[in-house]
């Protein structure tokens, strides 16, 4: 696991994990998964030493580019969606945004057992109700207290935050609303959110209909 230092209070600087992932993929190296500040690499029994050296070499090249504060467009010329700014400026803006939105504290809350959502029904029952037409579209901002009919998770990292049959909580809703804002600020880094749909540019989710009759 690679931990980017911008997530740690004792370090003032770091490189966004999504940017590192994009850079490595441009070099033919695909991480297993990543989030804001961590990247997971899997080593297999048959891997050669050269594979690890290739990864370390690519990371060293990116570190050098960071130290030289090179333009992001120069580091990843094939990615036109990235902003026109130097890598230190982008990294600083990225971590400032995360800390300003207090996202690390929110994530700790989401994965604390006392904050897990209630499940008024099983996932199987939720799926049956959805297939039988007992669901309705709900604007994301109005989802608190409603029962979701499908799993909702950002990918990467691919960790389910809300399973079918569970209830949207204030904290879970806050996180997905944060992701919407994050996507507007850093569109190139926005993860795919399974279970979140768009209609006329506005996010909505499928929930149990208030009128099931």
Q: Which residues fall in each region the model found?
A:
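Non-catalytic terminal extensions of PLP-dependent enzymes
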Residues: 1-213
């Amino acid at each position: 696991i690679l931990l980017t230092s911008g997530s740690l209070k004792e370090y003032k600087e770091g490189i966004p994990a999504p940017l590192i992932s994009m850079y490595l993929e441009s070099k033919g190296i695909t991480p297993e998964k990543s989030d804001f500040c961590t990247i997971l690499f899997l080593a297999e029994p048959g891997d050669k030493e050269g594979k690890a050296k290739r990864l370390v070499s690519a990371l060293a090249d990116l570190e050098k580019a960071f130290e030289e504060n090179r333009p992001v467009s120069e580091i990843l010329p094939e990615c036109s969606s990235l902003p026109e700014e130097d890598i230190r400026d982008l990294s600083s803006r990225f971590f400032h945004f995360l800390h300003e939105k207090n996202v690390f504290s929110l994530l700790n809350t989401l994965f604390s057992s006392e904050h897990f959502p209630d499940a008024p029904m099983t996932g199987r029952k939720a799926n049956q109700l959805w297939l039988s037409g007992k669901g309705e579209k709900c604007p994301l901002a109005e989802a608190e207290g409603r029962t979701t009919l499908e799993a909702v998770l950002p990918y990467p990292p691919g960790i389910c935050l809300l399973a079918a049959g569970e209830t949207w909580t204030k904290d879970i809703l806050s996180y997905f609303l944060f992701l919407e804002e994050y996507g507007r600020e850093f569109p190139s880094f926005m993860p795919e959110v399974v279970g979140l749909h768009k209609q006329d540019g506005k996010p909505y989710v499928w929930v149990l209909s208030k009128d099931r009759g």
